[in-house]
């Protein structure tokens, strides 16, 4: 796991997290994304799925899901990109306060363009 956390402006710290799961010959990208979706929903009450679509990350097929939820008086937005490459599942998670999320899209996009699997 690799985590980057920005400063908290009082509404929640923006963050970018990359995880890696050894899957072997296991789940497809759709199944892996479904597993990540289930984990998000298990962790938060009142979560709203805003988007669920196929896309690419650094030239690799991916599923992108965007969520919104409130916790402790803060409304947060989270975007998750899921990929399965050579039996390994990768999840990139970008989170920020809902009001700040759109302003960080360029930062998140730069990180995604730089994503490499070696």
Language model regions located:
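Conserved polar/disulfide-associated segments of primarily extracytoplasmic proteins
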Residues: 1-84, 89-91, 96
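Surface-exposed amphipathic alpha-helical segments
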Residues: 92-118
């Amino acid at each position: 796991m690799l985590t980057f956390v920005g400063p908290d402006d009082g509404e929640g710290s923006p963050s970018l997290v990359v995880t890696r799961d050894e899957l072997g010959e296991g789940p497809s990208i759709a199944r892996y994304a479904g597993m990540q979706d289930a984990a998000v929903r298990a962790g938060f009450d009142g979560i709203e799925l805003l988007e669920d679509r196929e896309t690419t990350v650094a030239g690799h097929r991916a599923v992108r899901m965007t969520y919104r939820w409130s916790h402790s008086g803060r409304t947060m937005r989270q975007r998750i990109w899921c990929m399965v490459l050579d039996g390994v599942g990768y999840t990139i998670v970008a989170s920020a306060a809902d009001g700040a999320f759109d302003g960080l899209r360029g930062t998140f996009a730069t990180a995604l363009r730089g994503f490499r699997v070696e």
